[in-house]
């Protein structure tokens, strides 16, 4: 194993704010036990707390919700998963370098190793790499897509085999086995039950009827979580022991063959990379023969080849379609031809069979989308859904201030107005007005910045594309909505 600088672990001396079955603990406080492999190999893990993250989206003025199941670990267990994720990431990085697919996986590549062989990349730099490659071609074929319920369908046997392959002996040390066993055979305590035990409201939702999920239900759940997180521990030990066998669920047992790992654990991302390692190597070899490009950001991927390399793209399509236990998401997996005339979507099944036929469905895509950016063959823009997630909370926050200003002598506080500008205006961009300058303490500096900070970084990466909005229009919108 490589030597790690443990103090570089994120939030090394900090405690998390959420409540769980154990007391809050920093990595620094738990370090002695976590670094003791004998202790870890016999450690009893708490159940995870399961919850649903509801993301509200606006596309073309229409509201939709995406419901994602997550589960989070107790404080000590999270630190264990965090540490072992770095150990596994280091082993994965060595394999990726040795077998020459190091440039493929661009997410969850953190390393505390002193070798520094892996350079972290962002979704912005990954999107730039992809679109720059496509622009360099006179004509190119492109495949974009992702996998349906990726984490829920990872095959346990395949994942264990892939993880064992990272160890020279082909066998997991006892402590590593104990950690991965508790990730694969995880149990969950639903947060709805915990809210009920504290007499907090938890509105039921139907994930299959996204349009029926109200903002009021989302807000009520959020308030209940906030109240739960004020607790020192989420349940007294006696109540935990008396009820755990009756309440906990084991989602991985649902099919009888061992599928799925929880999304949201510190180790989930690196395990996804390990799961995909063999496919990544095969796809990279296929497209590299024709000078192509393959990038994967967790379950999102893009493959691009020059026009002459269509056969390599067909091979890559079939490799991605045959990943063990996971399926491509049909509505998000698309084949394109990109040339001077723009972007034309092709029929996926025909492409898989080695034929180039136009897409025959309704509303063919006219843009290649990857990691929050759209490319129409000429320019790169932020996706409308990405921008929509900025404008909705801006409207809500500004309108709330406008309501506070109604009535004679009533005015929103300066602190509230300042927060509005920090969160949603160019003044909130790192290093400007309401944010610390680059000379500030770095730990504080990186906690600041808003969506427009991200936009500014994207504009810097794509200097000749219309990424950033007109700042004067943003100020006018804020003033109009807040009636200031």
Residue ranges and their predicted role:
Residues 48, 52-82, 99-119, 199-215, ...:
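Short, conserved non-catalytic motifs in the polymerase core
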Residues 74, 78, 82-84, 91, ...:
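Right-hand nucleic-acid polymerase module
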Residues 137-297, 302-316, 362-365:
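Conserved polymerase palm-domain catalytic core
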